[in-house]
Amino acid sequence: RAILLGNLAQQHPDYSLLEQLSGELATMTGASAGTVGEAANSVGGYIAKACPQQGGRDAARLFAEPRKAYVLFGCEPSLDVANPAQALRALNAAEMVVQFATFKDADALAYADVLLPLAPYTETSGTFVNGEGRAQSFVGVVRPTGQSRPGWKLLRVLGNLLNVEGFDYMSSEEVRNEILGAEGTLPEGVLARMLPVTAAVPTPVQGSGLQRIADVPIYFADALVRRAPSLQKTRDAQVPVA
C-alpha cells in the first residue's frame, strides 16, 4: 500500500497540509507515503537550499510584490510561470534585471539590462538528485557554444569579481561535493531529516472565483525542448482538446 502525492498536490496552496495528512494517513493504515518529484532535480534543489528559507519569498510573491531588482537563472518568465503577464509587468518596472539565458528571447531583450550566456544542461556536467535520493552525475554531450558557459562557472566568476568568499570551485564535482560531501552521495536517511512532516503552513486562498489548473506538456517543459522543431511535431506536443 502506498500514498503518493503528485504535481497537482505540490502546486496546491495548502500542500504542506496535504503532506501532513498523507503522512498521518499512512501511519494509521500501515502504508508508505511518498511524493512524485515535480522535476528531475527537485530534491537536489531542496538539498542545496535553492528554495525560500524562513521568512523568504517564493517566485509567485516576488512577482506579485514587485522588487527593484531581479536575477533570473535559466528562467523564461513568459513561458515558465503561472501568471506571465504579472511577471513581465514586474520585470519591465524593475530598476535592474540580470538574466542568465540560454536563448536570446524577445521578451528578455525588452526587460533585461544584462544577458549572460548560459550553457544548457546538455552542454555542462553536473549532478541531479532524484526522488529516491539517488545522486546521478553526468557530463555534457558537447562543448558550450560560443561564449556561453556552464551556470556554476558564471556564478563563480561573479563571486570572484565581487570578492565574495567561497567561490573558488574549479569543477562541477567540487560544487557537488560541497553540497553532498566528499563521497558525492547522500547519507542514509538525509531526506527524512531534511523534510520532516511536522506542521502545516497556512496559506490564504480565495473562497470564490476561478483558479487556473494547467498541465505542462512534456515537450514544453524547458527552453531547449520548446525550441526543438522535431519534438514540437510529435503527438505529445499537441495542444490538449477538451
Predicted segments — roles?
Residues 15-19, 152, 173:
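An alpha-helix initiation/capping motif
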Residues 36-37, 120, 170:
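Short loop/turn and capping residues at structural boundaries
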Residues 48-147, 153-165, 173-242:
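A cross-kingdom feature strongest in bacterial/archaeal respiratory oxidoreductases
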Residues 13-14, 32-33, 161-169:
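Short helix-capping/linker segments at secondary-structure and domain boundaries
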Residues 2-64, 212-216, 224, 229:
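A glycine-rich, hydrophobic/aromatic-adjacent loop/helix-cap motif
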